[in-house]
Amino acid sequence: TRALTRRFAYLVTELGILPGNLLCVTFTNKAANEMRQRIHNLTGDEDTGYINTFHGFCVSILQEDSHAVGYPKSFLVLDNSDIDAMLQIIYDERGLTLRDMTFSHARDMIEMLKLKERPEYYEDMITLPLDTLKEKYQKATSAKDIIFYGYLYQEKKCFALDYNDLIEFSLYIFRTHEDIRLKWQKRLEYIMIDEFQDIDPPQYELMQVLCGYHKNLFIVGDPDQTIYTWR
């Protein structure tokens, strides 16, 4: 983190790069806040550019360009308690109980389905009308499908996104809207990533896209420190 902080300060103070043209990605909000404070101390600049987690940065992308996927700028970012509230609605509507699947297991299952088994799920969320998603949910018979399609339906109905969606929706926008992709690529002159050993494939793809114009990517990682080996 110290290496990234020093590099950020050098780019701003010595090379005259505007902080708004720099992206620095950390893995936790705590690390991002610490880095902002360190950079402010080094540069004296109130503007510390984009220093954020992957998900926090994707919120910035979507707040600017969510119209490209038919979502309002005021979309909701879901935490676990929000997801559990949606699961409760689904369980009540379809007569499921915690004996069928606990909420914790259901959350894990949804994440694994989105990452591994059904990675194109976001196309359903973006392109299918709400009624069609509802129909998929109502026609589902297995607990797995009831929970998964019920959850996608609830998300779309509330204009809500979970952490997986933030990345996938951003990637979808960049794949389908060249003008938006180019705008972000040109804006981000230098990209730096901390804890690179814990990155997952969608996050890796997002970084590849973003550094595709200036091609200035700087990463810091330690393979002995990885905490997400399942990725």
Predicted stretch roles:
Residues 58, 114-118, 192, 211:
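Short alpha-helix boundary/capping elements
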Residues 54-57, 106-113, 169-170, 187, ...:
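Short acidic/histidine-centered micro-motifs embedded in hydrophobic/aromatic stretches
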Residues 46-49, 67-164:
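ATP-hydrolysis module of ASCE/P-loop NTPase motor domains
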Residues 1-71, 77, 158, 182, ...:
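P-loop NTPase Walker
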Residues 1, 23-24, 31-32, 50, ...:
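Conserved helicase NTPase motor core
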